[in-house]
From Swiss-Prot:
Membrane-spanning segments: 88-112, 124-148, 166-190, 203-222, 248-272, 322-345, 358-379
Glycosylated residues in this chain: N22, N34, N68
Annotated compartments: Cell membrane
UniProt cross-references to PROSITE patterns, sorted A to Z: G_PROTEIN_RECEP_F1_2 (PS50262)
Molecular function GO terms recorded: G protein-coupled receptor activity
Keywords from the UniProt entry: Cell membrane, G-protein coupled receptor, Glycoprotein, Membrane, Receptor, Transducer, Transmembrane, Transmembrane helix
Signal sequence range: none
Pfam family, one: 7tm_1
Cited function: Orphan receptor. May play a role in brain function.
GO CC annotation: cytosol; membrane; nucleoplasm; plasma membrane; receptor complex
Protein name, per record: Probable G-protein coupled receptor 63
Side Extracellular, residues: 1-87, 149-165, 223-247, 346-357
Tissue-specificity statement: Brain specific.
Amino acid sequence: MVVSGVLTAPAVLTAPHSGTSNTTFVVFENSHVNITAPLPFQHPSAGPLLRYSLETMTSPGFSSLAVNSTAVTPAPAVFKSLNLAVQIILSAIMIFILFVSFLGNLVVCLMVYQKAAMRSAINILLASLAFADMLLAVLNMPFALVTILTTRWIFGKFFCRLSAMFFWLFVIEGVAILLIISIDRFLIIVQRQDKLNPYRAKVLIAVSWATAFSVAFPLAVGNPDLQIPSRAPQCVFGYTTNSGYQAYVILISLISFFIPFLVILYSFMGILNTLRHNALRIHSYPEGICLSQASKLGLMSLQRPFQMSIDMGFKTRAFTTILILFAVFIVCWAPFTTYSLVATFSKHFYYQHNFFEISTWLLWLCYLKSALNPLIYYWRIKKFHDACLDMMPKSFKFLPRLPGHTRRRIRPSAVYVCGEHRTVL
């Protein structure tokens, strides 16, 4: 047995009986004792003496004693850190995501701010979504990137809590915008109610930001108290037995994913059902109705089905764009939400050796959504595409133009031909 200590106020205890091993315990205040001999090899008479010595060490005179026994307490499990190749790959991916997220969403915000023609209700909502994604790229992604490079959090506990608040604030705001747009599409296509205007869109944006802040703010004040991350590249939820902590994780998972997912899914199912019924009703009209029945039915009776067909074409394309955004949201956020819940309630999952790598890949997948959104706007929305090309310097206009069949063919002032000599205005 080896006993070691750091010298301040010594006291010596020796084995009192003959025939025992020459075992001496040197006890010091503020000392560190390291017992390295396994228990089976200790002399039987040393047991009572060891207990007596430890009791003496815990007396008021030795209140600062720290004992480290490798024979009794196993070493804590050490998680598997990232190897150099994985670090390089993850760092390169994050740099790409950060670059595209910041510049792409910045362009979206500038287009809506600078161009009056772009300030429709839907575009204002999309600008708010882009603003949240841009702030996520500025206030969260760089620190996660540094943590990947250093494999430890170096920014302190306060900023750990603050970054967690920012993360969930921007996430909840982005989800709220998707929810508002989906409900608006549902009201327009299913309920035939177009209630959203730019003023109401701004009010809804203010309400969504206030709601997101009220949900995320407790993280900044340490309720629940997040520890400095040692098993993830940023402050995330980890295993705990605290019921309040667990309740908060469930609440934020419901608000940020499950409730919006169910509401948006219901809205999209209703929209798809309505579009299918409208398509069947429109195609049920005979081809010659314009010419053979125009004099009997009148032009006003013909205007509604044809106008419905035109409106459904536009609404279907806008709905498809929102559907793509929703699909990206599901693919990027469903794994991370599941991971957060399992890590909070499963000790085995949280303490497995490759948890750091798992959490990093899933977090990167979440950040990928912020980079994909502006690319979807550019691909699907012609106004954003054209405005983006107008803002770019001529030397950088290398992006291809949209195919001809995707350009808008119908204008609100157009005249739609019903027959050879009949038109509907």
